[in-house]
């Protein structure tokens, strides 16, 4: 079957791409590589290749996956996507049960099966893994690209420590299926997947294919030390924080925001696009 690979040329794992593709060759044959070097390249390549290939291998992190998800046609009409995690966070890959390493993931993909996944409609953009606003986004904003590349997932811990000295709060109002959470908040997270910031399971019950989004609100009054302890010990947040679930959410806040780790104005509404694309996942 015709297959191509869109690959983030700036990935710290670039030299491992040939080894990963060699492991996929028995299933997909020869896989030509299309490097994506500049912002927007992966999205453009995905749109151009969508009608030419049956399988699109994506080598990169959540930002590359984000671009590909925005370049492909909706409704499962595009190619089957195979993820080779090669970024800092690799959170969508984690949500699928793939190891955050391109060669190890390629081994898993050899026997993986297609799975219909949801996307989140955030207005002009779609999110593959989720939306994080407030403290979670600020932790990423303090990181430079070289720091992320050098430290890998540990960069998010460094960012969290730097942003968390005196974290600001913002007024926020979130509504899902008639349920409303309103007040000063540290963060609002809207998840398709549950992992954020390189394997921190902020919404562990989220399912990327259930047709629902999951919302976590971190109120301003919660103990910062308690949050830090939970994230350091369990890589999760306390279970008693406000959580909502439904097919759509309305979010009113001025928090800084990121979609799949990429800067973006906080969307006023987020709606699930059920079964919007097909991705290989471990059986």
Walk through the language-model features, giving the residues of each.
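Short Gly/Thr/Asp-enriched flexible loops that form oxyanion-binding sites at enzyme active sites
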Residues: 64-76
């Amino acid at each position: 079957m015709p297959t191509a690979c869109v690959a983030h040329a700036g990935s710290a794992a670039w030299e491992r791409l040939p080894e990963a593709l060699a492991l996929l060759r028995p299933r997909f044959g020869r896989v030509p590589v299309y490097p994506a070097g500049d912002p927007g390249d992966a999205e453009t390549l995905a749109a151009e290749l969508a009608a030419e290939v049956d399988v699109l291998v994506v080598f990169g992190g959540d930002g590359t996956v984000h671009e590909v998800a925005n370049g492909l046609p909706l409704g499962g009409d595009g190619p089957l996507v195979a993820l080779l995690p090669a970024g800092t966070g690799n959170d969508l890959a984690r949500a699928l049960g793939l190891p955050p390493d391109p060669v190890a993931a390629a081994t898993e993909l050899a026997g993986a099966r297609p799975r219909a996944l949801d996307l989140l409609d955030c207005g002009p953009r779609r999110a593959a893994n989720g939306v994080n606003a407030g403290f979670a986004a600020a932790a990423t904003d303090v990181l430079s690209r070289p720091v992320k590349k050098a430290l890998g997932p540990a960069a998010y811990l460094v960012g969290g420590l730097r942003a968390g000295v005196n974290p600001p709060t913002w007024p926020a109002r979130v509504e899902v299926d008639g349920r409303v959470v309103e007040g000063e908040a540290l963060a609002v997270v809207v998840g398709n997947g549950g992992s954020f910031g390189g394997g921190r399971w902020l919404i562990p019950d989220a399912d990327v294919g259930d047709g629902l989004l999951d919302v976590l609100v971190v109120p301003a009054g919660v103990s910062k030390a308690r949050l830090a302890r939970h994230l350091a010990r369990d890589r999760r947040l306390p279970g008693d924080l406000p959580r909502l679930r439904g097919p759509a959410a309305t979010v009113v806040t001025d928090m800084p925001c990121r979609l799949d780790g990429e800067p973006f104005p906080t969307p006023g509404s987020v709606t699930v696009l059920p079964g919007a694309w097909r991705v290989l996942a471990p059986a």
